[in-house]
């Protein structure tokens, strides 16, 4: 099953792409940061279309929980700020919700 790895790929591609814009606009980095940023956002959009889901909305809803966890990992690994207990509790709640959406039984 490639669902979880694909969500993880999508999350880090989106975060990386958005961070390129953040770096340009908030950290005074070169506009050249936008080139890999836009490519990363393209990878993000492509990855979400690879999710095994019948409906885009369901794929996006489940992705939200994975994205939140990945964002906190990014904050810790790239920005050097460790998530606090409220970040951790909130992310855990969201990931549980995402897992219910991803793995919940569906009537066919």
UniProtKB/Swiss-Prot annotation:
Topological category with respect to the lipid bilayer: Multi-pass membrane protein
Keyword annotations of the record: Cell inner membrane, Cell membrane, Membrane, Transmembrane, Transmembrane helix
Keyword RNA-binding annotated: no
Subcellular location: Cell inner membrane
Entry GO terms, CC: plasma membrane
Major subcellular site: membrane
Cystine pairs: none
TM spans (from-to): 4-24, 31-51, 59-79, 85-105
InterPro entries named in the record: UPF0060
Pfam families: UPF0060
SUPFAM superfamilies reported for this sequence: Multidrug resistance efflux transporter EmrE
Family listed: Belongs to the UPF0060 family.
Protein name per its UniProtKB record: UPF0060 membrane protein amb3269
